[in-house]
Amino acid sequence: MSVWICLVCASLLSCAGQLCQKQATRPSRRGRRSRHILFWLGMALLCLGCGMLLWLSVLQSIPVSIAYPMLSLNFVWVTLAGWGIWHEPVARRHWLGVGLIVVGIVILGTSV
């Protein structure tokens, strides 16, 4: 698997873990709160663990000075997910920041 694909997958898994944690805090049906929390926190651990393993393989191939800034993709994924899944409001400034992050990632990625 390409190291760049691994990097994107590691980022997506990290974000999935964060989103599962958010979902664990959401209301659930009465009497099912403990099961709800345990399920989503378990999913978070699974996603974060798999993301970490992929991240380790990325670090074997790419200098950390290049790889780590690429994780700023997480801000993009989480913003899109919060807006799309939970309909969280996102201000124009926030969208501008997300756009600048994407531009920075493209510049960094093409400099390798």
From Swiss-Prot:
Pathway: Bacterial outer membrane biogenesis; lipopolysaccharide biosynthesis. Belongs to the ArnE family. One of its GO terms (cellular component) is plasma membrane. InterPro entries: EamA_dom, Flippase_ArnE, Small_drug/metabolite_transptr. The gene is arnE. This is Probable 4-amino-4-deoxy-L-arabinose-phosphoundecaprenol flippase subunit ArnE. GO terms for biological process: lipid A biosynthetic process; lipopolysaccharide biosynthetic process. Its main location: membrane. Keywords: Cell inner membrane, Cell membrane, Lipid A biosynthesis, Lipid biosynthesis, Lipid metabolism, Lipopolysaccharide biosynthesis, Membrane, Transmembrane, Transmembrane helix, Transport. Pfam families: EamA. Translocates 4-amino-4-deoxy-L-arabinose-phosphoundecaprenol (alpha-L-Ara4N-phosphoundecaprenol) from the cytoplasmic to the periplasmic side of the inner membrane. It comes from Klebsiella pneumoniae subsp. pneumoniae (strain ATCC 700721 / MGH 78578). Disulfide bonds: none annotated. The lineage of its organism: Bacteria, Pseudomonadati, Pseudomonadota, Gammaproteobacteria, Enterobacterales. PANTHER family: 4-AMINO-4-DEOXY-L-ARABINOSE-PHOSPHOUNDECAPRENOL FLIPPASE SUBUNIT ARNE-RELATED (PTHR30561:SF23), SMR FAMILY PROTON-DEPENDENT DRUG EFFLUX TRANSPORTER SUGE (PTHR30561). Residues 35-110 form the EamA domain. The keyword Lipid metabolism applies.
